[in-house]
UniProtKB/Swiss-Prot annotation:
Family indicated by similarity: Belongs to the universal ribosomal protein uL16 family.
Organism: Sulfurimonas denitrificans (strain ATCC 33889 / DSM 1251)
A Pfam family per the record: Ribosomal_L16
Keywords, comma-separated and alphabetical: Ribonucleoprotein, Ribosomal protein, RNA-binding, rRNA-binding, tRNA-binding
Quaternary state and interactors: Part of the 50S ribosomal subunit.
Name of the featured protein: Large ribosomal subunit protein uL16
GO annotation, cellular component aspect: cytosolic large ribosomal subunit
CDD domains: Ribosomal_L16_L10e (cd01433)
Domain of life the protein comes from: Bacteria
Function as written in the Swiss-Prot or TrEMBL entry: Binds 23S rRNA and is also seen to make contacts with the A and possibly P site tRNAs.
Length: 141
């Protein structure tokens, strides 16, 4: 699972996920990519599940880059616990995704196979995404 080795603070405030991606919206490594169309939150399990499904489909040929990293802790209180007594313990690690952010990039496989693999991966994600190529890289959506 993806998570930071160490953080300055254990817990973080919730915050708001508004606006568009100001970084990570162009292709940097691969030829084809998966780009977020709407805002959402992705956790380490979802990233790993999508990565495994895409990697299995391309039969470990080519290369996949994960362009997101869950560095924000989400807390949760235990079940059947009364309110109060402080903030809960860290439950999972997430990253806020804004529209336009690239999630995965892929290279070294035929485009049709890459599209099929990324389609399998996008079904594992909790927000709408689309598949883009190098020509479409500069568009936000």
């Amino acid at each position: 699972m993806l998570m930071p080795k160490r953080t300055k603070y254990r817990k973080m405030m919730k915050g708001r996920n508004r606006g568009y991606a100001r970084s990570g919206y162009t292709l940097a490594f691969g030829d084809i990519a998966l780009k977020a169309v709407e805002a959402g939150r992705i956790n380490s399990r979802q990233i790993e599940s999508a990565r495994i499904s895409a990697t299995r489909h391309i039969k470990r040929n080519g290369k996949i880059w994960i362009r997101v990293f869950p560095a924000k802790p989400l807390t949760a209180k235990p079940l059947e616990t009364r309110m109060g007594k402080g903030k809960g313990s860290v439950d999972q690690w997430v990253m806020n995704i804004k529209p336009g952010r690239i999630i995965f990039e892929m290279a070294g496989v035929p485009e049709e196979l890459a599209r099929e693999a990324l389609t399998l991966a996008l079904h594992k994600l909790p927000f709408k995404t689309k598949i883009i190529t190098a020509e479409m890289s500069n568009e936000i959506f």
